[in-house]
Each structure stands twice: as C-alpha cells, then as structure tokens.
Amino acid sequence: MTDFISSKAANDDMKHILQKDELIKRIDTCLQMTSLPRNIYEPYIARPFQTSGFFDELSPYIQIDSNGYILIQYERGIQMLHKRTKVADEVIYWILEDTIFLTTYIDMMRKYQVDNIQTHLPNDPSIHQQIVDRVNESFRAIGGLYEQWHHEGKRASIETPAKK
C-alpha cells in the first residue's frame, strides 16, 4: 500500500509542478527529521532558488517554469549543468544531498575549530569517515525514496548533463 501511495504521489508531482515555497517546506520537513543543527542548514534551504548574485561552486540551483524544473550548476562561474526534470522528488533529493553534506562539513569545522581559510580539517581518514557516517545517518532518518537514492548514488545521474 505504501508503494502505491508514494507511486501515486510521484505521479501527482509530475502532473503538478511544485513552486519554490512548497519545495522549501518539503526540504525543511526532511531536514527536521535529522540530528543536523538547524542553525547551520536553515540559511542553505532557499539558496538553490536564488536567481542572481554569486553562485557557489557545484551547488544546485533550480529554476521553475510551467514545464517543470531546470537543474543548474556552476563551476568557476561557468554554467556546467542545465538540465530539465518534471520530478519534484529529484529536485528535493538533489538539494538534500548538497545541504546535508554542507551542514555536516560546517558542523565538523566548528567541532575542530577551523575556518577553512587559514585552518582546515585534518586530512585524516577518521574525519572523512565521520562525515560519511553523519550523511548516511541523516538519510537513514529521512528514509524512503531519498535514502534509497542516496545509497544508489543518484546524485551522479542527476548531475550528468542530458544528451543533446
């Protein structure tokens, strides 16, 4: 029954394009299920929807139009990804992946009292493992399709440019 409901919800999302506020609300609801510090992740939830200014390296950006969502990513100021989807869950998942990793990394920087400018996290396998574990723990807390996609590595396919 749960599979039918989530399948039906996914089909409904394909027919109805969710707007920025609804996407942000769903992302926030997912993040509240985790143990991640809200004061760190909260400023990053709306960032993917900004339309001007400085675009962070390799971070997700989203434009919404009547045909769906445009997934955008910049590297060194150059747009490297411009891809369409009609699936709101892909947008939510993509933003969750970025926000969860970023929040975990910033939290680790605070724990080790580094600023990532003059001081950096030690290049230590145990630090890397703590980050991986915390990201996995966050997706486990969220569960469902987003946890499945995380373990399948769906972010890589989302960030692969569409064939022309």
Task: State each model region's role.
Residues T51-Q79:
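Short aromatic-glycine-(Arg/Gly/Cys) micro-motifs in beta-strand/loop hairpins
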Residues M80, V87-D89, M109, Q113:
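Generic alpha-helical propensity signal that fires on short helical segments
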Residues M1-Y61:
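N-terminal "first-domain core" detector
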Residues T85-T104:
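Ampiphathic alpha-helical segments that act as solvent-exposed interaction surfaces
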Residues T2-D21, T104-K164:
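Intrinsically disordered, low-complexity, charge-dense segments enriched in Lys/Arg
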